[in-house]
């Protein structure tokens, strides 16, 4: 029987809820201590700065927020990590729907992502890799919207700039994705000439640098 849109959405919600609960409860029960990267993030968060020689500040900021709310409860930091993963699943699901225009294939896309090591077994350890996931997905999503749209929307450019900035504030190596995006649009505009330069592109850069200036 073919799946309708409502059934697909219900399956997706059941899946992400199951993932959230499973990967929060299991490490809470089985681990005697928090993972080392999470402990390190909590230590940095207690003396939060705009950046460290090893990592940017966001991977320390979010654990510190949860520490202020929940205190030294291990489950809270496993839960925090899964929130980031689940948000990524929502973005991937949305992006897949726009690209594939097929609900079943979009659902399968999320299932395939779940099978990747970095979206399951390593996710209880909140670190820069987990922290960057939703911002990476958002950056790709809004890049796709700008690339695929005949009329570029200003808010897409604003959100792209914000997602890219928060990505850099999550992990320094996020810059590789941004360089790849810049090279793609430079090629499309100046060499292939399949797209025209739009000053709205500069809005993304402005938002990006405004967020990073502090």
What are these model-predicted stretches?
Residues 63-67, 80-91, 132-135:
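Transmembrane alpha-helices of multi-pass, membrane-embedded glycan-processing enzymes
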């Amino acid at each position: 029987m073919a799946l309708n849109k409502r059934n697909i959405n219900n399956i997706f919600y059941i899946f992400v809820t199951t993932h959230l609960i499973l990967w929060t409860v299991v490490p809470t029960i089985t681990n005697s201590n928090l993972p080392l990267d999470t402990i390190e993030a909590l230590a940095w968060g207690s003396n939060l700065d705009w950046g460290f020689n090893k990592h940017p500040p966001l991977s320390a900021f979010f654990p510190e927020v949860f520490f202020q709310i929940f205190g030294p409860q291990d489950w809270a930091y496993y839960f925090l990590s899964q929130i980031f993963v689940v948000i990524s699943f929502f973005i991937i699901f949305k992006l897949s729907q726009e690209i594939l225009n097929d609900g079943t294939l979009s659902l399968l896309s999320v299932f395939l992502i779940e099978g990747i090591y970095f979206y399951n077994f390593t996710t209880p350890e909140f670190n820069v890799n987990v922290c960057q996931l939703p911002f990476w997905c958002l950056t790709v999503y809004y890049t796709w919207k700008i690339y695929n749209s005949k009329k570029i929307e200003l808010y897409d450019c604003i959100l792209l700039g914000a997602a890219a900035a928060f990505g850099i504030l999550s992990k320094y190596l996020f810059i590789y994705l941004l360089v790849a995006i810049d090279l793609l649009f430079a090629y499309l505009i100046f060499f292939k000439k399949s797209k025209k330069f739009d000053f709205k592109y500069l809005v993304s850069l402005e938002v990006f640098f405004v967020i990073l200036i502090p």
